[in-house]
Every structure is written in structure tokens, then in C-alpha cells.
Amino acid sequence: MFFFLVFSACEVFVGFSLCTLVISVPFFFLQMTPFYSILCFLSFFALLLHLPCSIYSHTLHFFHHFTIACYHYSLCLSLVALLLFYTLYPFQSITLPLMPFLEKTESSILTISHVYSPPTIITFDGFKRLLRMHVPFYTLSFDTFSTHTNFFPRHTFPIFIARVSLHFVKQLSLSI
């Protein structure tokens, strides 16, 4: 029972961190679409239900597995929606009120390699300049007009995400 509670607590902590990261970036820095807002709400709602059900799973076995499924599916949908949001949303209608230094870069093609999938090409207006100015602690390797870019080593991806998230939260707190 003790190990189950520890595992549930770790799962909730990791899930909450992922949901916070997925929701905070487009909410504070981009225009959020209604569809994406609904997915974010479902992620947080399922996450809030997941914590008590993990603790009392011996009496709420079915409800526990139901909320876990809802939480995982909503989180996956949110991640997919985030990817589509960054790749398919028109560049002209993106507003970044906290980052006015972004400039038009027509050839900023970024390739992110995933462990279990082929490289995914993501185009974003000013993405190179954004990361170079906001992530000084990480050396980025860009190759414009290339179909494959070594953006970051796979084993440093969680550290990279954590540092970028903390930096954005710090900048946001200073601007409020």
C-alpha cells in the first residue's frame, strides 16, 4: 500500500507538471483556441479527480481506473493539440505580448527528433531568435534549410523542458 501511494503521488506530480507546462505556454504567450481550452480544462479536471481516487482506490477501483484513463487521454489530446497549434496556426495571427523582440524569419525550420517516431518538422515564426534569447544556458545547433537538425540530445530533453518552463514562469512573474 505504501509503494502504491508513493507511485500515485509521483504520477500525479509528473502529470500535474506536464499539464501545467502544456497549458501555460499557449495561455500566456499565444492566442488560445476554444478547442484547446476545452482539452486543457479536461486535463486539469481529470487530474484533480485522479489524486483522491489514487488514495482510495481499494474502495473506488472502477472509478480510479476511469479517471486514470480520462486523465491520460486528455493529456495526450492536449499534447497533440499543442503540436497542431504550433504547426498549423497562421503565423500572422499569433501575438506574443510578453516577447516583442520576435522578428520575421521565413526559413526557421526546426526538426525535433523523437525516440519512437521519425523527425517532425515544426515551423515557427522567430523560433530560433526566441530560444537563443531566452535560453542562454543551452547551446542550440540550427541548420537552416535542413531536413534534420540536432536540436537537443534525447537524454537532456526533460532538463531542457524544465529549464525553459522555469525561465518562462520567472519572466512572467517579473512582468506582472
UniProtKB/Swiss-Prot annotation:
GO CC term (a single one): endoplasmic reticulum
Transmembrane segments: 3-23, 27-47, 79-99, 107-127
Protein's name in the database: Uncharacterized protein C56F8.15
Coiled-coil stretches noted in the UniProt entry, renumbered to this chain: none
Membrane topology: Multi-pass membrane protein
Subcellular location, record wording: Membrane
Species of provenance: Schizosaccharomyces pombe (strain 972 / ATCC 24843)
Keywords: Membrane, Transmembrane, Transmembrane helix
